[in-house]
Amino acid sequence: MTEPLNVIEIYPKIFVYKGLFKDIENTYSLLKESQGKEDGLFSPWTQWSRFGEYINPIFKTYNDNLKIEHVEKVKTSTEKQEEHKQVLLEILNNFMIATKDYIAKNNVDFDENKIVPNVKDQNGNPIKEWEYTGPSIARYRIDIEDPLAMTYHTDYIREPIVTPGHKFAITALTYFNDDYEGGEIDFIANGDAYMYKPEAGDLLVFPSGHPDFLMSENSIYLHGVMPVNHNSKYLSRMYWTKYSAGAPEWFENEEKFGKEKWQEMQQEIMKKFRDENPNRNNADKERRIK
């Protein structure tokens, strides 16, 4: 008989899953000691924007979006390689356990096997409506002096014209340690602000800010991250994404400018959009719940 999940809804549609990892301290130790040079599978740590470092790709010589079925087939020849393989499998399997429960409890219209009609990828293969991505394993710098390590944002990428493709819908963050100061995640939704300090082994699932899913009344969910001190914060980021057909205006502009030219124009268009619609850097106007 399967044991019931230890899950806490800390705020509407924000769930914390606890106790999923067999030995979170060992997982943390393996990640912390990994330099990408030993006889393991993990790649070296490389720069992650201005926030810190991440392991990219996860495994040496493999792409950065390994599915469970791919990881299960990875051959290992050393004890360290097998340990790294099991770490990744546990992260992936726990993601599935938590997010499938979250999807059911929040009545998300979800079919993992549904195919997008009349659309193929660049190789002519069918496209699934829902795809998961990750994990991206990262660690935050300890010398960020700004009030926020990451400003309030949605993982869903805001666009002036919706492009065709998969969009972030559900975010799942796994936390491997809590031996640091700070590092809280702060949510803004529907005029409320709610701050949570993750504990080692927590798997936090919440809306990515997609305007068609998991709203708080008429409000999307924003989240920001506080800086850490003394020790880095180690975490994994994973997502469920849902395919969008794209706005009619997108295809009208493809016809007008040509596909290649219209694609080349996106960098400047997106920069202008971000400059005119910056992320928030405080929650001063919200009602503080916690």
What is each of the regions a protein language model found here?
Residues 149-157:
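Histidine-centered catalytic micro-motifs
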Residues 19-20, 138-140, 155, 175, ...:
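Structured loops at beta-to-helix junctions and adjacent beta-edge loops in soluble globular domains
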Residues 139-142, 160-181:
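Short, conserved beta-strand element in jelly-roll/cupin
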Residues 2-123, 127-129, 136, 143, ...:
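Non-heme Fe(II)/2-oxoglutarate
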